[in-house]
Amino acid sequence: PNLCLGLHVNVTNGYALAPKEMIPSLVDEHGIFLSSTIRRAQIKNNEPLFSEEDAYIEAKYQIEKYIELVGQLPEYIDLHVLEVEPLINAVVRIYHEYNVPVCYYGMDLEQGIIDQTMKQYDYYEEHDHDFENMFIDGYYQIKEGLNILVTHPGFIDYDVATTSSMLKERLYDYSLVTSEKLKQWLRDNEIEVISFRDVKK
């Protein structure tokens, strides 16, 4: 009951939940999402991506699947890889329909500045242990207000290993967020770790 669970809307990895005929701009002929590599190339070349309507249909299928599996609404929604207008607009429509808060880069809250980052991945390029030193040594400065560190800790199964380019980083993230040394440093510096549930209060 203490775990704050959200929906990570994905339109670039694996099979879509919606039937492929309903979301033609998102998937290939097998119903598999076009990859983030393809999407980033399209963005770089100023090519059209996908329609807002297709993104909305898929996001709706995903939130309904979440409700089926978890038995309740997600406490927040965020976006996987792409933060582009058609996807943001689609997810905002989901927010209005289900009243579930949306978290994305560039967001702003009245109660303070948000610094949202994945800066640890730059740190990992030159370090393969003692990841908590990213904070302790000041590589990442925690600012006044709300700071969001986006991490990807978790179990790496066959599907993840064969579809994701982020494997080593997941292991490093797990080591970082479970570090007792980091937890003690946060306590010593009176830095509170909160969930999105606390932000909504």
Predicted segments — roles?
Residues 52-119, 133-136, 140:
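Catalytic domains of cell-wall/extracellular-matrix polysaccharide-remodeling enzymes
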Residues 8-14, 80-82, 107, 118-123, ...:
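Active-site beta-loop-alpha junctions enriched in small/polar residues
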Residues 1-4, 21-31, 67-68, 140-143:
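Acidic (Asp/Glu)-rich catalytic clusters
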Residues 120-133, 162:
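A conserved mid-domain beta-alpha-beta active-site/ligand-binding segment of alpha/beta enzyme cores
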Residues 16-49, 165:
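Active-site gating loops and adjacent loop-to-helix segments of metal-dependent hydrolytic enzymes
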Residues 99-101, 136-157, 192-194:
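Aromatic-lined glycan-binding groove of carbohydrate-active enzymes
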Residues 2-8, 74-78, 101-102, 146-150, ...:
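Structural preference for beta-strand elements that scaffold enzyme active sites
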